[in-house]
Regions:
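P/S/T/G-enriched low-complexity
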Residues: 1-224
Length: 224
């Protein structure tokens, strides 16, 4: 994340019109969601947890301001679940009013979408839904998997693909219309179903690569 911030500042140094510079916001996600801006925690019983919250609102990232962005990233400490749905919901509110601005969301995660410790279909479904709303509004969503087993090369419709890899594909712009919805199978039960839709294509006609692992996250330098 810090190398990405450095790259944004480097590129902004070549943009003379401040109103047209790339702007950056930082959102963290862990436990309960709060609309307060900052880096706050809350207590449940004997444990403290991170809120899911906006840490820094949208602002130009320049050589003069990049340290403020990096310090926010460096201040994040693991404490709580991985409430991806709350993070992406908060990200929806962090978009520029400039109609000509390219909207990009970069979703870093080091684990499974959870409420506690296991994969949560409910959290994953909501997260995919929030991501789809942003994609429908014209945003490009990159997902970066910083966890063991992250494998963007795997076809999410293939056999033996983990829910985590399916989730990372579905959140990203690899699949613009992806959903993960609850469908009733009888009057008393149902299940969550992945529906990826068509794979987006790059300018070269090949499959789009909006889902990346830590090993190829450096490609983000070429996003803008």
């Amino acid at each position: 994340a810090n190398s990405f911030i450095d790259e944004i500042a480097k590129q902004n140094a070549t943009v003379k019109d401040a109103a047209k510079q790339h702007q950056v916001s930082i959102v963290k996600f862990a436990g309960n969601k709060t609309d307060k801006v900052g880096n706050d925690t809350y207590r449940e019983g004997q444990y403290w947890y991170n809120y899911s919250q906006v840490m820094k609102t949208l602002a130009p990232c320049t050589n003069d301001t990049k340290s403020a962005f990096s310090s926010q990233v460096n201040a994040i400490q693991p404490a709580g679940a991985t409430n991806a749905a709350a993070g992406l919901e908060l990200a929806k509110g962090q978009t520029s009013d400039r109609s000509d601005a390219k909207k990009v969301v970069i979703f870093f995660t080091d684990g499974t979408p959870t409420e506690y410790s296991e994969f949560s279909p409910d959290v994953a479904s909501s997260a995919v839904g929030h991501a789809k709303e942003m994609k429908d509004a014209g945003a490009a969503v990159y997902s970066i998997g910083i966890f063991q087993g992250a494998d963007p090369a795997k076809n999410p419709d293939g056999q033996g693909v983990s829910n985590e890899n399916k989730f990372m594909h579905a959140v990203s712009s690899n699949y613009p219309s992806a959903t993960y919805s609850y469908e009733s199978t009888s009057w008393w039960s149902g299940e969550y179903i992945w529906n990826f839709g068509d794979r987006a294509k790059g300018s070269d006609g090949k499959d789009a690569t909006f889902y990346k692992s830590a090993t190829n996250a450096d490609d983000l330098k070429h996003v803008f």
